[in-house]
Amino acid sequence: GMYNAAYLIELTDTRRFVLKVAPPDDFKVMRYEKNIMAAEVEVLRLLRARTEIPVPDVFAYDTSRRWLDNDYFIMSFVPGTAFNKLREHLSAEERRPIDIRTGEYLRQIHAIAHSNFGYFAQPNTHTSTWRAAFISMLEGILADGKDANIPLPIAYDEFLPRLERYLYVLDAVTQPRLVHWDLWDGNIFVDPQTKQITGILDCERALWGDPLMEANFGAFGSNPAVLTGYGVDLLASLSARTRRSLYNLYLWLIMTIECTYRQFETKDQENWARNKLDEELKILDGINYE
């Protein structure tokens, strides 16, 4: 993974497992990443208990530091190939059922509700309204950027005031729902022979929030087959499109700022995300209200 280190364990009886190890305590992480290994373990267990989604089985989760200097967990191995590596080699007829099934799985994830909003593994930051939770998330990523002296297209202290006039649209979200928030093709594993989904991975960034926040709903374009599987058009209203734009802004901020924290070798992602950030601010400013 991009955050936790993952190791394949092969036993002499041919069984395979995956060991995931958290970064060391002194590793500089962004605020929203605190405690995300606990989130991954708990969300995997929750999805296994409450949905029909194929997710790995968690066999051990250890925070004692007795065997390793870091937190770790052991889960079942998911066979198959990441869909992002497979997609271009499949026909449209082969891709469509996989995308439809992804939409169906998202619907199952979002059926799981909670009493408060916020990042799954940070209950001390949870709030009773989505607007308050989202403002807190924005404040967190802006503080991360400020800590690392990362320049943004507008001054840090002007960012939230710039968005203030749009934030009321978040009040339409009243029921906290489980949001995977990282269900891109790289986290969907598929059997190359049967074209069936063998596993959904990497739910450590899960949160209790607005289902529309899933990147599948318009962050990187829209996939009609995913929407067909999901069964509801979440982007039907102007208010929803404004919420989507706010969520995009948050995502582009993370993708800009995380490059410094991750120490990426190139500036490719950062440059791309900066352009998206500029575009999104213009989109928001261009939204007309009656």
Q: What is each stretch, according to the model?
A:
Residues 1-150:
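ATP-binding pocket architecture of kinase catalytic cores
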Residues 3-9, 19, 58, 107-111, ...:
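Active-site acidic catalytic loop and adjacent metal/ATP-binding pocket
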Residues 12-14, 66, 193-195, 249-252:
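Short strand-connecting beta-turns/loops that link adjacent beta-strands
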Residues 17-19, 27-29, 195, 207, ...:
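Membrane-proximal envelope and lipid/glycan-remodeling enzymes
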Residues 98, 151-163, 240, 268-280:
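Extended, well-ordered alpha-helical scaffold segments
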Residues 131, 143, 176-179, 184-245, ...:
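Active-site Asp-x-Gly
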Residues 132-133, 144-147, 171, 255, ...:
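Preference for well-ordered, secondary-structure-rich cores of eukaryotic proteins
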Residues 255-290:
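ATP/Mg2+ or Mg2+-diphosphate-binding catalytic cores
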